[in-house]
């Protein structure tokens, strides 16, 4: 499993992502990657390690705690010129087993973590996104308790669910088992107000496979078979 996880982490270098949120089933693996012993060397091989976030992962002294959030500044011709780019803050949380705090799961209760950190992040960014490994019901509770949040991405729904608006917070769900590709588009007017459009596309046989991704997958499978 460790070799398989390494290959997945390396894929995030080939197809970069801005943020990696720790999910409930990822907590053990995340702590192995964040172990202080050899961290610099691992992060050089797998830079995605530096993009791991979690506001409620509890770690011991032998592990370097991930930041609770990251801020990415973006710019473009459709973003009103304010002398700087648009600062997007990503806060990562996950729902512990049983929905509350359980020391055996190395987690802190995610609702308390969000309430504590959302005001801090809100002061630093223009758009606040919570990436939450939880279901739609708890994502709605996060929105109710943290009305300063602009967008919540719920990444553990039981099935494909339509977007939901709670106050001014826009909630979208990631499709389970990578069955669909989500596309969330944000529109910023001249007054600095956001509106959203969400599309979800079936990843079926009608969607052509990327040749580079197919070649990478074949190489990964060959490597895993060699290690078995």
Tell what function each PLM region has.
Residues 1-228:
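Acidic, metal/ion-coordinating pockets
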